[in-house]
UniProtKB/Swiss-Prot annotation:
Disruption phenotype: Microaerobically grown cells show 38% decrease in cytochrome c oxadase complex activity. Between 0-5% nitrogen fixing activity of the nitrogenase in root nodules when in symbiosis with soybean. It comes from Bradyrhizobium diazoefficiens (strain JCM 10833 / BCRC 13528 / IAM 13628 / NBRC 14792 / USDA 110). It holds the Pfam family Cytochrom_C. Residues 54-290 are periplasmic. C-type cytochrome. Part of the cbb3-type cytochrome c oxidase complex. FixP subunit is required for transferring electrons from donor cytochrome c via its heme groups to FixO subunit. From there, electrons are shuttled to the catalytic binuclear center of FixN subunit where oxygen reduction takes place. The complex also functions as a proton pump. GO terms for biological process: oxidative phosphorylation. Binds 2 heme C groups per subunit. The keyword Iron applies. Residues 109-198, 206-287 form the Cytochrome c domain. Pathway: Energy metabolism; oxidative phosphorylation. It is a single-pass membrane protein. It is found in: Cell inner membrane. Its cofactor is heme c. This is Cbb3-type cytochrome c oxidase subunit FixP.
Length: 290
């Protein structure tokens, strides 16, 4: 049989016999070791299809000869972990808050569990570290609208504030301007008076006596004499440097005119009692708990 192979004079290799615009292609076979490895991978893939789950079906998939399922393994591990956690969380749930504080193991468990739950449920409003934001209280300081003891914190988490729960904290900042209780100039005057309570500068020439009179007639009932606040009503202390909605004149005018009524959701029914207790312990440990 006649061999019509054409050799390339430079490389000494045969060409494929094809030519495009004067360009010829060398016939360079793949290395034998590479070809062997390639076929071995095909054999391995076929074996994998047979042994392990591989092909999707209409409502399931092929299970393979080994019947292996990583999902089943994960489910078993999660069940084991849940059992371990369940026993520990049951002990946490059975203990009082005072007992949790006295037991190092339960306290560590509550803080660890509380931190995780806080990150999943509370961080979107209060921040990952509980530092808060405008309209969302800072949980690291010692300024508490509804009280900062362990029991008070747990009650707030359970029932929320203005959440609609039967046991929720009620109380809101009235809209003195919107409801026509105070006129515009009166709101400006009392806003400056409120700023003066915490040592903030006031508008030049404002009538302090008039501001105090307006405050006594309209604000003392909730915020108390001197503006020290009232935790039973969720009324903030107006004499410190902590302001939930801002301390500048414009922010205070808006607050007095339009009112404030932020909502804290009730977590009872969403989280189990042990988890709520753990969250209360964690929040209390952030630095501002009393």
């Amino acid at each position: 049989m006649t061999d019509h192979s054409e050799f390339d004079s430079v490389s000494g290799k045969t060409t494929t016999g094809h030519e495009w615009d004067g360009i010829k292609e060398l016939n360079t076979p793949l290395p034998r070791w590479w070809v062997i490895c390639f076929y071995l991978t095909i054999v391995w893939a076929i074996g994998y299809w047979i042994v392990y789950p591989a092909w999707p079906l209409i409502s399931s998939n092929t299970t393979g000869l080994f019947g292996y399922s990583s999902r089943a393994d994960v489910a078993v591990e999660l069940a084991n972990l849940e059992k371990i956690r369940g026993d520990k969380m049951a002990a946490l749930g059975a203990a009082s808050l005072a007992d949790v504080e006295k037991d190092p193991a339960l306290l560590a468990l509550a803080r660890a569990k509380g931190k995780t739950v806080f990150g999943d449920n509370c961080a979107p409003c209060h921040g990952s570290g509980g530092a808060g934001a405008k309209g969302f209280p800072n949980l690291n300081d010692d300024d508490w609208l509804w009280g900062g003891t362990l029991d008070q914190i747990m009650q707030t988490i359970q029932f929320g504030a203005r959440s609609g729960h039967a046991k929720t904290h009620e109380g809101q900042m009235l809209a003195f301007g919107k409801d026509g209780v105070l006129k515009g100039d009166e709101i400006v005057t009392v806003a400056n008076y409120v700023r003066s309570l915490s040592g903030l500068p006031t508008r030049k020439g404002y009538d302090a006596a008039k501001g105090e009179k307006i405050f006594v007639e309209n604000c003392v009932a909730c915020h108390g004499d001197g503006g020290k606040g009232n935790q039973e009503m969720g009324a903030p202390n107006l004499t410190d440097k902590i302001w939930l909605y801002g301390s500048d004149e414009a922010a205070l005018i808006e607050t007095i005119s339009q009112g404030r009524a932020g909502v804290m959701p009730a977590w009872e029914g969403r989280l189990d009692p042990s988890t709520i207790k753990a969250m209360a312990v964690y929040v209390h440990s952030l630095g501002g708990g009393k």
